[in-house]
């Protein structure tokens, strides 16, 4: 009897251990999903789409199988060829999406095998009847205002705080674009008096450009893990980009240091580290291995993965923007792990916690990576960042939160004040409280800074550049453009009728934004469903032309005055 009892106890313990292991694995997978995937994917049985398709019931589903979602042509072809998401296929895809399905728009994988296995286990448990809801009908009179068919070079926009609708005035849309090949003969539309041409083409679809002192154009090929460089022999067009550095981890932001004609380093922001590469003016190949300057940027690296760099005007401060891990931090709880005063003394006024610790911020360091401190908080995703060459002001373009409606809240461009709090996640555009976090931080009311320029909601402003014609530039823009800021609007997914997909000119007066912006380059949207281009970054070339990087078509466009 004693032997039988011991055997039963052992079996029970083994069963409990197995159950505990399964629960732990499920929790680990769910945590991985929340920290890395939830910004873009839902797991509800309605298969609602965000920037990416719904993942409920993904195991056993054919690739590109969510009705109504605008998949890349690469995944559509894979699904048509019979690709189905088994555990093995999903594991391979998540390890390296671009290698498994070349041409996919999935931006980032899960390289760690154990973490990936837990995520696949979690997704495997999302099974049951699918109750896909019919797409909401667009309220055309309200939603088409500010949409793509309003785009027209020369059109001026001025959105005011008093223009904001209430939350949930429209339903939240999952309306990502289907990217098509550029139709023969199609070109972007630019203002009268300007001409647009192809400057370079790169199948790796780089995103952010940076001009070197000698005029070379550096490009962050984020998905490839490379930095590339373009050299235009005649100023009009460039040959195929050359690879400057490889082996990087989703590089995005770049900055030369020190400023001036003879920098010593190219600083590069990886997804969770800052490195610097020895550089001398005119180098086309890295002259040394990357040196780690900051080994870890934040405890989590999922969610928004772009990191942008800039140096202060005196070269003494290295600035870094880090986007949020989630849409609106609903999972972090109402209180930090220590009293708010103590927490904010370490992380800044309005600094979030949990998976959002040191996220949605601009951080500051000395050029050697030491003396880390919080520069500003509440900036959900400052993708574009620069230091104004005249005023020395730090400036950000910010992608605001999703799922409050087609026209709420606006994205924005703003000067960023040291110690400033810009609202996220509890407030938006000043003292407007997010209803999903209602009542959690009344102490912050009145502390959120209203941004300088409100941009049509869900436009997704990315890279920007102050227009300053280099000395002796042969293709300088007219004088009235001098000092204004060009911004690439990547385009919406969370709006019933898409918006963005253009480059705009932000009007400045004595280095201060006026609040108005003007359409400058458009014409990349084919219909409510399809686009052929998505502006991601801008730079002023050595000859004064404006370069626009399109990361959908892999094209660098050149815009110059007609002579």
Predicted regions and their residues:
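Sequence/structural segment immediately N-terminal to covalent heme-attachment motifs in c-type
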Residues: 25-46, 55-56, 119, 200
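Gly/Gly-Pro-rich "capping" loops immediately C-terminal to redox-active cysteine motifs
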Residues: 30, 42-87, 105-107, 243
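C-terminal capping alpha-helices of c-type cytochrome domains
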Residues: 84-134, 546, 552, 561
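Beta-propeller domain segments
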Residues: 137-192, 263, 324-373, 377-521, ...
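Surface loop/turn motifs at the tips and blade-to-blade linkers of beta-strand repeat domains
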Residues: 198-203, 243-249, 293-301, 374-378, ...
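Hydrophobic core register within WD40 beta-propeller blades
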Residues: 209, 254, 309, 382-385, ...
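Conserved beta-propeller blade signature
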Residues: 216-220, 263-267, 317-321, 393-397, ...
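Asp-box/WD-like beta-propeller blade repeats and closely related beta-sheet repeat scaffolds
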Residues: 241, 250-251, 255-257, 264, ...
């Amino acid at each position: 009897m004693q032997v039988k009892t011991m055997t039963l106890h052992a079996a029970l313990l083994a069963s409990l251990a197995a159950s505990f292991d399964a629960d732990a694995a499920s929790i680990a997978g769910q945590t991985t999903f929340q920290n890395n995937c939830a910004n873009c994917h839902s797991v509800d049985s309605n298969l609602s789409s965000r920037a990416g398709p719904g993942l409920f019931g993904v195991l056993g589903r054919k690739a590109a199988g969510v009705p109504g979602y605008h998949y890349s042509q690469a995944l559509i072809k894979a699904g048509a060829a019979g690709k189905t998401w088994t555990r093995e296929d999903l594991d391979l895809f998540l390890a390296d999406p671009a290698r498994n399905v070349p041409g996919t728009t999935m931006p980032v994988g899960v390289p760690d095998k154990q973490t990936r296995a837990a995520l696949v286990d979690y997704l495997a448990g999302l099974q049951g009847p699918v109750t896909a809801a019919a797409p909401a009908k667009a309220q055309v009179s309200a939603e088409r205002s500010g949409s793509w068919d309003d785009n027209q070079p020369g059109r001026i926009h001025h959105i005011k705080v008093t223009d904001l609708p209430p939350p949930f005035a429209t339903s939240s849309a999952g309306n990502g674009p289907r990217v098509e090949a550029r139709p023969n003969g199609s070109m972007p539309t630019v203002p009268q008096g300007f001409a647009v041409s192809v400057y370079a083409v790169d199948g790796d679809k780089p995103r952010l450009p940076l001009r070197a002192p000698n005029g070379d154009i550096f490009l962050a090929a984020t998905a490839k893990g490379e930095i590339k460089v373009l050299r235009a022999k005649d100023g009009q067009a460039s040959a195929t980009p050359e690879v400057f550095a490889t082996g990087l981890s989703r590089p995005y932001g770049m900055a030369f240091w020190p400023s001036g004609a003879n920098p010593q380093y190219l600083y590069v922001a990886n997804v969770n580290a800052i490195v610097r590469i020895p550089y001398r003016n005119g180098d086309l190949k890295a002259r040394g291995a990357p040196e780690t300057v900051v080994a870890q940027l934040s405890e989590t690296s999922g969610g928004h993965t772009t990191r942008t760099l800039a140096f202060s005007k005196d070269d003494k401060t290295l600035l870094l923007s880090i986007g949020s891990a989630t849409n609106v931090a609903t999972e972090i709880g109402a209180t930090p792990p220590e009293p708010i005063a103590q927490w904010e003394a370490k992380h800044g006024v309005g600094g979030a916690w949990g998976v959002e610790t040191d996220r949605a911020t601009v951080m500051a360091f000395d050029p050697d990576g030491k003396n880390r401190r919080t520069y500003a908080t509440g900036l959900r995703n400052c993708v574009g960042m620069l230091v104004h060459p005249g005023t020395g002001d730090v400036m950000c373009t910010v992608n605001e939160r999703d799922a409050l409606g087609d026209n709420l809240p606006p994205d924005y461009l703003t000067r960023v004040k040291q110690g400033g709090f810009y609202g996220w996640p509890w407030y938006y555009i000043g003292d407007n409280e997010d209803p999903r976090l209602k009542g959690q931080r009344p102490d912050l009311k009145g502390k959120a800074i209203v941004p300088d320029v409100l941009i049509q909601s869900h436009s997704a402003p990315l890279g920007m550049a102050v227009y300053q014609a280099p000395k002796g530039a042969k293709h300088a823009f007219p004088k009235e453009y001098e000092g204004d800021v060009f911004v690439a609007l990547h385009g919406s997914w969370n709006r019933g009728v898409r918006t963005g997909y253009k480059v705009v000119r932000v009007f400045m007066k004595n280095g201060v934004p006026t609040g108005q912006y003007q359409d400058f380059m458009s014409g990349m949207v084919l219909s409510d469903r399809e686009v052929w281009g998505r502006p991601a970054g801008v730079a002023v070339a050595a000859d004064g032309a404006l370069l626009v990087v399109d990361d959908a078509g892999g094209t660098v466009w050149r815009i110059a005055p007609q002579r």
